[in-house]
């Protein structure tokens, strides 16, 4: 009996301590620090606060229609902020999240078998994980039997591969999510509600509640509809900045240039976007991926879109070797490089044709499943 009383006393003490901590907690206090390297390869600790995370959970739960019957399959490692979209809503609703063995993402048939075995009905994966399934014609052998919500993000979904998914699961909802870690992971969404041409890009749509997207030009002025500007985020989704790095924080968390009346921070994402004729936000590319080549300004993403349109191509990645002044294209597909280049000459102007083209057996991926552009850049420089 004595140990039981001691345990009870310890529990009471812990409860009081926890209550005291919660009672002093502010919604602007840090809740976690997650390290991200983005496109630079240099880790930065992003400090999120309770307010931004709570708002994120509410918005994501509404968009993906979470409830206690949601059966989620986790794709990203738990040390990436992307896993939060699975863990927090699961806790909020008493839903279920299954941790998918990392090795299965190398074997698409076994991956779909896992989804069926555990009756997974919702996924929120990076595009590379989804295209790996469709590009290897997995659906000819096995289909996900329970999936009704497929959310994706972090990369542009090639329309050709998206069509395969939608034709395979015609009753499912497909949702494109967009947002940087500095905006608590995701801050925009678009539910795919129509067919797209192969040369189109799926919109990132509209911002979450309590968030606004500003498209600013180089002079910090709003761009006109249809023009490209830097995607800047304002609102509750903003994190607190970079841990112990005030210099870097002040570079991208800046005073709203459209507001000269009181202090208000916005986050400059480094992404370029525009609004289409429907008023939907379109992701164009990273500023890092916009290059000057042969006297022309080029979006590397535009090259990738045209490559991915080709029937025999599964996926591609274009990088720029600035030192040598060459565009290098890496791809997975059935075509040989010389045949691919001949096709591209009918699709692209001469200055956008890759100087080097290399066929890969497998696309290198980062730990969270995205195409590893930093690795491919180094590979191109070593050629």
Identify the meaning behind each predicted range.
Residues 33, 75-76, 100, 125-126, ...:
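Short hydrophobic "strand-cap" motifs at the C-terminus of beta-strands
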Residues 1-2, 6-16, 36:
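Conserved small/polar residues in nucleotide/adenosyl-binding loops
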Residues 92-95, 120-124, 134-203, 212:
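Gly/Ser/Thr-rich phosphate-binding loop
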Residues 17-35, 66-72, 78, 210-211:
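Conserved pre-ATP/AMP-binding loop-to-beta segment of ANL
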Residues 44-73, 81-121:
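Conserved AMP-binding/adenylation subdomain of ANL enzymes
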Residues 9-10, 14-23, 53, 173-176, ...:
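AMP-dependent adenylate-forming
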Residues 33-46:
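Conserved adenylation A10 loop of the ANL superfamily
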Residues 9, 95-118, 124-132, 156-157, ...:
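ATP-dependent adenylate-forming carboxylate-activation enzymes
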């Amino acid at each position: 009996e004595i140990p039981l009383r001691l345990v009870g006393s310890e529990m009471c003490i812990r409860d009081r301590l926890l209550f005291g901590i919660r009672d002093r907690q502010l919604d602007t206090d840090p809740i976690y620090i997650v390290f991200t390297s983005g496109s630079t390869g240099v880790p930065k600790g992003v400090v999120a606060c309770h307010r931004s995370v709570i708002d994120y959970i509410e918005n994501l739960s509404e968009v993906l229609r979470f409830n206690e019957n949601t059966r989620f399959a986790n794709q990203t490692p738990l040390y990436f902020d992307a896993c939060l979209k699975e863990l927090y809503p699961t806790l909020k609703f008493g839903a279920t999240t299954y941790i998918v063995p990392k090795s299965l993402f190398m074997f698409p048939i076994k991956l779909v078998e896992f989804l069926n075995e555990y009756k997974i009905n919702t996924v929120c994966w990076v595009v590379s994980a989804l295209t790996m399934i469709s590009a290897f014609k997995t659906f000819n052998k096995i289909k996900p039997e329970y999936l009704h919500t497929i959310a994706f993000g972090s990369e542009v979904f090639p329309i050709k591969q998206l069509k395969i998914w939608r034709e395979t699961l015609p009753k499912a909802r497909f949702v494109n999510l967009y947002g940087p870690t500095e905006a608590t992971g995701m801050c925009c969404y678009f539910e795919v509600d129509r067919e797209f041409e192969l040369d189109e890009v799926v919109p990132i749509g509209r911002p979450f509640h309590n968030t606004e997207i500003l498209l600013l030009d180089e002079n910090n002025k709003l761009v006109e509809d249809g023009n490209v500007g830097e995607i800047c985020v304002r609102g509750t989704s903003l994190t607190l900045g970079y841990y112990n790095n005030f210099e870097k924080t002040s570079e991208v968390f800046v005073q709203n240039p459209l507001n000269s009346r009181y202090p208000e921070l916005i986050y400059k994402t480094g992404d370029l976007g525009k609004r289409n004729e429907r008023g939907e936000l379109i992701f164009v590319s990273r500023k890092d991926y916009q290059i000057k080549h042969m006297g022309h300004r080029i979006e590397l993403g535009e090259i990738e879109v045209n490559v991915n349109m080709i029937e025999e191509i599964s996926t591609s990645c274009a990088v720029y070797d600035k030192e040598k002044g060459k565009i290098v294209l890496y791809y997975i597909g059935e075509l040989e490089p010389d045949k691919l280049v001949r096709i591209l000459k009918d699709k692209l102007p001469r200055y956008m044709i890759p100087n080097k083209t290399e066929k890969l057996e497998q696309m290198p991926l980062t730990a969270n499943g995205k195409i590893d552009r930093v690795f491919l850049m180094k590979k191109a420089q070593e050629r």
